[in-house]
Amino acid sequence: MPVGRSLSLDPNLLAQLQSHSPTLWLNPHQGMPLPDFAPTAADLADADARLRRCAGLLAELFAELRLSGGLIASPLQPAEPLKRAARAGHAQAGAWYVKRDDALPVAGSIKARGGFHEVLALAESIAERHGLAGADTDRRALASGAARARFARHTVMVGSTGNLGLSIGMLASALGFRTVVHMSADAKAWKKARLRTRGVEVVEHAGDYAKAVDAGRRQAAGMPCCHFVDDEGSRMLFLGYATAAAELAAQLAQAGRPVDARHPLFVHLPCGVGGAPGGIVYGLKALYGEHVHAFVAEPTASPCVLVQLAGDAAHPRSVYDIGLDNRTEADGLAVAQASPLAAALLRAQAAGAFTVDDRQLFAHLLDARERLGIDLEPSAAAAFGGPAWIAGSDAGRAYLRGRGIDPDAATHVIWATGGSLVPAQEHRRFQAHARAQRQVGGAGA
């Protein structure tokens, strides 16, 4: 049987994916009922409340967070220069912004939102169970000697391509937990080194992300007092990401950008296993409903969420199943199989997905540097082509027409997911590579 035949994928879509051709796919399932296990409004409120009550603790642990009072928040930067530079005039409709999660302190990526939330939830649970904190206790008590001694009896473990490991590792080790990060072959050396300088145990694997996660899960299962952060199915991670929605809503209101039937919001999010974009989309849908249109961006070598959403919902699918190799410079997005939790929710809520090849990643990375003064890692630039796909492609224009959307009234938010902690020499290497490829023929559409 030919590769991909049994996945219930449209043959034309399958051919596009197998050819590594950048593709926009529109989700026909958008608007279907949410699964029964979907988080509730109370779950979202609890996550937001947790991050707020722990803000003082975070400010005490990390000097970088004192300016924000310990809140995990990033700027919303206008992207008018990027819009003006769009190659096709028809891609310039609406107002463009970049959500700067690349600038999140301490962890330097979007993973701070989910990772910090899960570690804080664990720390609160242990402290309350052992009488070290109550419902009204100042959470700075979790940095006390007694709390650290208790946490030292516990291990926090995670599997990661890099950024989630940084997020979990930085906070868990700061609180006194023994911390172990299983890292895939895609993980960058500087991320491993940064963790080790914080006393985190890094276990390196020759395999991909899924193998690193599975190794961590199996090791954790045999250890007492060990909490495994499961990027493929964690509700705590998912809810932490969802808290970004209220932050973005406040920033859009401050910028004078309403979100309603006449003024739709388009959000473009880099996507690996799906948890971070899934959580953010879930939070935004809770606020704006049908007026938010979310598109996830994946490497052409690793479109695991697109494959899962476009295929049979009942069976987990991998990019390997359609003959792709999951090899990309976007190390943070090098994931072969989607999170079942995130995929089930994105199936009901995402407007679609688009793919980006490595040449485009580096072109977008260079645009971010030259037009906006932002230094990104390659995976963080994956979504920069989103507005052009919507306004400049046949499928994108059909999506707008089908919903009666005036493209000039839309707001586009491009999520930049990581880069501020990348060493300067790495940024220079990224940008030199991008300039070299531009000189020999550009990056394509």
From Swiss-Prot:
Q: What cofactor requirement does the entry state?
A: pyridoxal 5'-phosphate
A single Pfam family it belongs to is PALP
Q: Which InterPro entries match?
A: D_Ser_am_lyase, Ser/Thr_Dehydratase, TrpB-like_PALP, TrpB-like_PALP_sf
Q: Which UniProt keywords apply?
A: Lyase, Pyridoxal phosphate
The protein depicted here goes by the name Probable D-serine dehydratase
**Annotated positions of the N6-(pyridoxal phosphate)lysine modification:** K111
Catalytic reactions of this protein? D-serine = pyruvate + NH4(+)
Residue ranges the record marks as coiled coil: none
Single Gene Ontology BP annotation:
isoleucine biosynthetic process
Q: Report which superkingdom the organism of origin falls in.
A: Bacteria
Q: Could you say which protein family the record assigns here? A: Belongs to the serine/threonine dehydratase family. DsdA subfamily.
Native source organism of the sequence? Burkholderia pseudomallei (strain 668)
Q: Which NCBIfam families match?
A: D_Ser_am_lyase (TIGR02035), PRK02991.1 (NF002823)
Q: What is its EC number?
A: 4.3.1.18
Q: Name one GO molecular function term.
A: hydro-lyase activity
- Top-level enzyme category: lyase
